[in-house]
Amino acid sequence: MKVRSKKALFCSVSRLLHTERHTERQNLTTLFNRYVDKTDVFSWNSVIADLARSGDSAEALLAFSSMRKLSLYPTRSSFPCAIKACSSLFDIFSGKQTHQQAFVFGYQSDIFVSSALIVMYSTCGKLEDARKVFDEIPKRNIVSWTSMIRGYDLNGNALDAVSLFKDLLVDENDDDDAMFLDSMGLVSVISACSRVPAKGLTESIHSFVIKRGFDRGVSVGNTLLDAYAKGGEGGVAVARKIFDQIVDKDRVSYNSIMSVYAQSGMSNEAFEVFRRLVKNKVVTFNAITLSTVLLAVSHSGALRIGKCIHDQVIRMGLEDDVIVGTSIIDMYCKCGRVETARKAFDRMKNKNVRSWTAMIAGYGMHGHAAKALELFPAMIDSGVRPNYITFVSVLAACSHAGLHVEGWRWFNAMKGRFGVEPGLEHYGCMVDLLGRAGFLQKAYDLIQRMKMKPDSIIWSSLLAACRIHKNVELAEISVARLFELDSSNCGYYMLLSHIYADAGRWKDVERVRMIMKNRGLVKPPGFSLLELNGEVHVFLIGDEEHPQREKIYEFLAELNRKLLEAGYVSNTSSVCHDVDEEEKEMTLRVHSEKLAIAFGIMNTVPGSTVNVVKNLRVCSDCHNVIKLISKIVDREFVVRDAKRFHHFKDGGCSCGDYW
């Protein structure tokens, strides 16, 4: 075959490579000998480009090397595809060699060669080399800007990516040609903005996207959704608006909006999106979709829905997927079924550090510290090395059970034995462990010895311990530090108010309340969740909105009569108001967890377990009441509060009244 036109030759070579090479699997040399005019550089360029585009990067480099051995003079089109092949192979050595050859032949300043070099160096983690190439480009275009921004984003340098984007805007405003960032570049910029802790940054780039008319595109829209899921200030409403505006929604779109809902505690909305996705015949779901829905289940404690998702996982053959498997473990643990979680854990063929950590954390939050500390050495023996989060889970398990000796042991072993530097979360666990165990001074001394500045979690852990052990002096020290860090957190004021109330210092209680009022601070409402027949019911304190409210209060009144007969005496210390005892008792009767428990008993079969999720710590009175109710009605209640799980059964609690 002899093709005289270079354009025809390009088409012929590409066609033959696609047909014969991928069917008969003939090697590159045979194809060259039969079809390629080896003295023509354009023939070589077409072969290199075709191989690079089809993913045969190694053979693309071989073709480029073969061409150079023939001493052919390469054109500007010879280098970009060869450099792209180096990127795909993460071959920095060949990449630098190709760069050197481009320099020798005078193509280093070519915009397409330079952009390919930026991508290659960024892909190989050589950002300094990439930036040097970028800075030496005499006349940049949008491809070179985008390549460098993406390089920074790819390597986790979010600040540099955002800074370069700002430079682009300045460059663009001064340029009569007005370059326009494309959707690929915007995806990188949005991704970087979402990881920079600067107020309003995500919102600013969102406005930029709208002005450029990219807000309806699926790739940009999905990245914006992910940015808002990571904490964009616009909130859920803005994320939903973005989702609704995306014209051709794909699987990532659905996954992202479900993630926003799940992380915002709006589980019903996440479930509704999933139902819509299941009914959508065009978009299919995958392992990430199921993991996202399982996250929503974990937040809401919707066990029945979680079981349905688990069944779907089994039908799809995804139970061995390490991400999905770990999500199942986490879901069952947070729905109060730690033994079911353990069965799922044991069935996993491939476990990674997250799988082990999820199971250890599950045991810890349920108060099974012994099992958590038994599983931890087994993890080490299996060859899986514990990481930062693993030690947080181990120390938290020790804290829930008051195992201060074991806690110190593993805290001290972190750096020396495993090379994990203790961080704020680990110190927070230790302060919580020592404080709750009554070693307040030791907890305070540990804070004083910290190599890093204590954050609000550290001081709030000590403040909570001060309330348990009624230490007003240390509480005032703690809250002073907390107000320096964050004076707008209602929780700190409420804790201090409770500590003053426990000490009978009502003037100080009123003073704290006046400070809150003057600063416009409002206590976030406590609420409890309970799933029934696939729907999550939400209860507030003194709830007047629930459809069954009249029956619930009637049932509670009857329960209260039985409680009094059983010897119940209300614990009014949790009511932080200077009012008479009768009024305090009336307030306690309508706490959200009691309403949820009553609703659960009324609407489930006798003998079944009732699961409740509380967003705040269960108060002492509710804790005592639920213990007694479990004995009166012969039911088990599993309550997850902000601290841990409580399994109420036969008049007792799994926490041993230590929470």
Swiss-Prot record:
It is found in: Mitochondrion. Keywords: Mitochondrion, Repeat, Transit peptide. GO terms for cellular component: mitochondrion. GO terms for molecular function: RNA binding; zinc ion binding. PPR repeats lie at residues 40-74, 75-109, 110-144, 145-171, 182-216, 217-249, 250-284, 286-320, 321-351, 352-386, 387-422, 423-453. The keyword Manganese does not apply. Residues 458-533 are annotated as: Type E motif. Residues 565-659 are annotated as: Type DYW motif. GO terms for biological process: RNA modification. Residues 1-24 form a transit peptide. Residues 534-564 are annotated as: Type E(+) motif. It comes from the Eukaryota. NCBIfam families: PPR. Belongs to the PPR family. PCMP-H subfamily. This is Pentatricopeptide repeat-containing protein At3g26782, mitochondrial.
